Amino acid sequence: MIHSTAKIHPSSIIEEGAKIGENVVIGPFCIVGSDVQIGKGTTLHSHVVVKGVTTIGEDNQIFQFASIGEVNQDLKYQGEPTKTIIGHRNRIRESVTIHRGTVQGGGVTRIGDDNLLMINAHIAHDCQIGNRCILANNATLAGHVELGDFVIVGGMSAIHQFVIVGAHVMLGGGSMVSQDVPPYVMAQGNHARPFGVNIEGLKRRGFDKPTLHAIRNVYKLIYRSGKTLEEVIPEIENYAQTESAVSFFLDFFTRSTRGIIR
């Protein structure tokens, strides 16, 4: 079904069954598969391919040669009808690739709202991306990676399968990340190592001084106290009683399976 207000270039191929919403613009030489839904106000600029069971929300901007919902690169994949779900107001720049999920990984590759995926970024099967994240040019996520909200991944960085990156993390360019990264941390290198709290980013997002102070203290407990995580968690719980932002650390540690960067 194609909404009457949608504008579709005659060179594009829209397969029967695709659902194209109100005021959608599809530029030249795009291909949209039969199981694709595109929400109100989204633009496919040109040469965009959207396949598989893919849902794209409202007011997204998708630039030329992006590939969304294509067959993933997991050797176990046998053509199951897994999904790709993209939220609202994302900017997906040139040559970005986003692959559909796998049955073993939950069946969905999911991207939230208000993200910027720069040129040549790759999001593999079953990745879960939060809101307001930035992936700079050539940043690559392997399968099953999770990014919290407000994560910045520097250019030419690579994140290993199953890694969890906490909210408000900033990863410097060229980083190779093979272990989980706690919330609020800045990290860089091959392999990535922590080098402080993302203070400037937190200030821009309205974190007040008492909250920043608590986050810094938790960072010091984790990385400078010489104690194990098991030893510092009760102290983190004490901070969380008065500063709700600290609870992100506790939630993160309950889900972390790969160990944290050191």
UniProtKB/Swiss-Prot annotation:
Keyword set includes Lipid metabolism: yes
Any one GO molecular-function label of the UniProt entry: acyl-[acyl-carrier-protein]-UDP-N-acetylglucosamine O-acyltransferase activity
EC number: 2.3.1.129
InterPro entries: Acetyltransf_C, Acetyltransf_C_sf, Hexapep, Hexapep_transf_CS, Lipid_A_LpxA, Trimer_LpxA-like_sf
Pfam families for the chain: Acetyltransf_11, Hexapep
Catalytic activity: a (3R)-hydroxyacyl-[ACP] + UDP-N-acetyl-alpha-D-glucosamine = a UDP-3-O-[(3R)-3-hydroxyacyl]-N-acetyl-alpha-D-glucosamine + holo-[ACP]
SUPFAM superfamilies: Trimeric LpxA-like enzymes (SSF51161)
Chain ranges passing through the membrane: none
Keywords: Acyltransferase, Cytoplasm, Lipid A biosynthesis, Lipid biosynthesis, Lipid metabolism, Repeat, Transferase
Compartment(s) where it occurs, according to its Swiss-Prot or TrEMBL record: Cytoplasm
Family annotation (PROSITE patterns): HEXAPEP_TRANSFERASES (PS00101)
Pathway note: Glycolipid biosynthesis; lipid IV(A) biosynthesis; lipid IV(A) from (3R)-3-hydroxytetradecanoyl-[acyl-carrier-protein] and UDP-N-acetyl-alpha-D-glucosamine: step 1/6
Cellular component GO terms, alphabetical: cytoplasm; membrane
Function: Involved in the biosynthesis of lipid A, a phosphorylated glycolipid that anchors the lipopolysaccharide to the outer membrane of the cell.
HAMAP family hit by this protein: LpxA (MF_00387)
Subunit structure and binding partners: Homotrimer.
Family, similarity comment: Belongs to the transferase hexapeptide repeat family. LpxA subfamily.
Entry protein name: Acyl-[acyl-carrier-protein]--UDP-N-acetylglucosamine O-acyltransferase
Organism per entry: Histophilus somni (strain 2336)
